A protein has these predicted regions:
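A short, glycine/Asx- and small/polar-enriched loop/turn
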Residues: 38-42, 160-166
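Protein kinase-like catalytic core scaffold
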Residues: 44, 106, 166-169
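ATP-binding N-terminal substructure of ATP-dependent carboxylate-amine bond-forming enzymes
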Residues: 1
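A short glycine-rich, hydrophobically flanked beta-strand micro-motif that places a catalytic Asp/Glu
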Residues: 150-162
């Protein structure tokens, strides 16, 4: 199907598919830039819907109040945004693998945990271990069946303050650390 991957790179589309697969996501609202959230409580984080929109990472802002969001809107280039509840995470982890047969067969050998020593960094170190969480793997497999994706991918998650797991995104490509699998 022409354009399917491009459509699934949209944060609203892929997070809706993730929820259908049984994965949890941070609460969100899709808004026109300048529109205040109707259901979210602060703090929130602003994200572009796709990396091809706006100023991509420069449009990401953590806002602790309505006043901070209004100020952030003055800098944001994207016409439409995904506003998400900002979760003070314990950490992030991801997996790299591949799916074939329109997402019916998924291979994920390793999980990578980012080692964060500072709140304002993604982590300078990573640890790799076998991916053994069967419950999470089943949900990921369902997500890939929903996407019908064939190819290499990286899928990212965040661990919340009470160890809850939130889906963040899929990159439909190899990541920079994929050498660890080979």
């Amino acid at each position: 199907e022409q354009g399917r991957i491009t459509r699934q790179q949209n944060k609203d589309v892929i997070t809706n598919l993730a929820v259908e697969a049984g994965l949890s996501i941070p609460n969100k609202e899709i808004v026109d830039t300048g529109t205040l959230p109707q259901t979210l409580k602060y703090p929130i984080i602003t994200k572009v819907l796709a990396s091809t929109m706006g100023a991509w990472k420069d449009d990401v802002h953590i806002c602790n109040s309505e006043a901070e969001l209004i100020e952030a809107y003055k800098k944001i280039k994207s016409p439409k945004l995904c506003l998400q509840e900002y979760i003070h995470k314990k950490g992030e982890f991801c997996m790299e693998g591949f799916s074939i047969n329109d997402g019916k067969d998924v291979f994920i050998p390793l999980v990578c945990n980012y080692q964060r020593y500072y709140d304002n960094s993604y982590g300078h170190y990573m640890t790799f271990s076998p991916f053994t969480d069967d419950s999470l793997k089943q949900k990921i497999c369902t997500l890939f069946q929903n996407t019908k994706y064939n190819g290499i991918f990286e899928i990212e998650f965040m661990r919340g303050p009470n160890d809850e797991i939130y889906f963040l995104e899929i990159n439909f490509r190899a990541s920079t650390w994929n050498y660890a699998m080979t």
